[in-house]
């Protein structure tokens, strides 16, 4: 079982307390399910992406959280602010990066991995 959370499930961010609280809850659920289901050989992990290039992030309301001094921020202006949050020189990750992490955790290669939050975050949790 793979639950999708967010980097905000492992780190606090200003102005989105409701989102941070919900994503931290996913971590608690994942750990509880890992303990409950482990004896049945069911693995449970969570994935914690940074910004992903989807409409959830690529919209004016969200971009203004990251570029508050620009009334109508462009994708390029948002990219600069977003990249500054990451250790790796990328502004966001692609949906396929999350899909690949899910495939790995669901595969036999991860057969002994359970109860683990896996960041797919371009280093945002390190900065």
Language-model segments: residues:
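Residue(s) in the substrate-gating loop at a strand-loop-helix junction
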Residues: 6
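Active-site loop immediately N-terminal to the catalytic Tyr-X3-Lys motif
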Residues: 11-17, 39, 90, 108
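Conserved SDR Rossmann-fold cofactor-binding beta-strand/turn motif
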Residues: 43-53, 106, 119-121
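Short, flexible catalytic-loop segment of classical short-chain dehydrogenase/reductase
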Residues: 49-59, 63-68
